[in-house]
A protein has these predicted regions:
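Specific transmembrane alpha-helical segments of multi-pass solute transporters/efflux pumps
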Residues: 15-20, 51-97, 105, 133, ...
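Hydrophobic transmembrane alpha-helices of multi-pass small-molecule transport proteins
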Residues: 47, 68-69, 73, 116-136, ...
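Helix-helix packing/entry segments at the starts of transmembrane helices
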Residues: 36-38, 93-99, 162-185, 218-254
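Specific alpha-helical transmembrane segments that line the substrate/conduction pathway
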Residues: 34-45, 73, 81-114, 152, ...
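Transmembrane alpha-helical segments that form core, pore/gating elements
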Residues: 21-24, 44-48, 103-110, 139-195, ...
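Glycine-/small-residue-enriched transmembrane alpha-helix faces in small-molecule transporters
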Residues: 1-34, 68-71, 75, 79, ...
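C-terminal-most transmembrane helix of multi-pass membrane proteins
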Residues: 7, 40, 206-208, 242-288
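Juxtamembrane helix-entry segments on the extracytoplasmic side of multipass membrane proteins
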Residues: 1-6, 27-33, 37, 58-63, ...
Length: 288
């Protein structure tokens, strides 16, 4: 495996971290499920012409697999957006999500017999130590948002393993488009059943955050993610996605004043330290 997928994953994690900020601002006025539904449906519509022109249409079986993967993604994101609507500690939430992401290679091992390579077991202790330091000053009290984050994280870990597996056989733009459409449909359905549009309306500035969520944190991010996953192992992807809480913590510190002490800086350093190890292993092993 060359380094291009790993560098793509660095960009994906930056876009994902920005998505935390975009989403937090957007749902300050938009209903969470309505935000997810409209955001992902619009992103799917933007990708549809590209998929139609560049790639052959998927078979019915492939469409069903992609739709199932999209259902997992939709469930995870609806749980996630509910969690961030009730929490100001975005860095801590990103930590919880990343711990479950580390379990994705184990899920792939159980479901698809894709045993993680040696690099995963060697870098796993470093990654866990870094994540623990990143969350060192977090107050881990029992709160509703904590349970939402845990549920979202568990679903996301499974989805990542399934996504990577299907990315080997389904055209990337079609896979991304179908997943985003399913997520959007789930969000829209939940909005119609449980939410109401705010009577006071939505301010103009919120639509700017919404547009950034659609174009940057959804359309571009998930398209790049699918391309990267098609060329790397689940273990590589899971370890690379640990960069997301580092970027999220930095943004949360800059915009929301989340405390950033020496322990968190050390944790960020440990997470970043694994990058040279992954780049080295990328030259030695090709994904299966």
């Amino acid at each position: 495996m060359n380094r291009t997928p790993l560098l793509l994953m660095v960009l994906v994690t930056l876009l994902a971290a920005a998505g935390w900020l975009f989403s937090k601002e957007a749902i300050s006025e938009l209903p969470p499920a309505a935000f997810i539904g409209s955001r992902f449906l619009l992103a799917a519509l933007l990708l549809l012409p590209l998929a139609w022109l560049r790639e052959p249409p998927p078979s019915r079986a492939q469409m069903l697999r992609a739709a199932g993967c999209g259902t997992l993604l939709g469930a995870s994101l609806l749980l996630w957006v509910t969690a961030i609507s009730q929490s100001d500690a975005l860095g801590s939430g990103a930590f919880i999500m990343s711990v479950a992401t580390l379990m994705a290679p184990l899920a792939a091992w159980a479901a698809f017999r894709a045993k993680p390579g040696r690099h995963y077991w060697l870098t796993l202790p470093i990654a866990i130590a870094g994540l623990l330091l990143l969350s060192s000053s977090t107050h881990w009290g029992v709160s509703l948002s904590l349970f939402w984050f845990l549920a979202a994280a568990t679903t996301l870990g499974i989805q990542l393993a399934v996504h990577r597996h299907f990315a080997q056989s389904i055209a990337p733009t079609w896979l991304t488009c179908i997943q985003l459409a399913m997520t959007g449909l789930l969000g829209t359905l939940l909005f119609l059943l449980t939410e109401q549009w705010p009577e006071a309306g939505v301010s103009h500035s919120i639509w700017g955050w919404f547009a950034a969520s659609v174009l940057i944190a959804t359309t571009l991010r998930y398209w790049l993610l699918t391309h990267a996953l098609s060329k790397m192992t689940t273990a590589h992807a899971a370890l690379m996605m640990l960069l997301e809480p580092v970027w999220t913590l930095i943004l949360s510190t800059l915009f929301y004043g989340e405390p950033l002490g020496g322990a968190k800086l050390a944790g960020a350093g440990l997470v970043l330290y694994q990058l040279p190890l992954l780049l080295r292993s990328a030259r030695l092993k090709t994904p299966v």
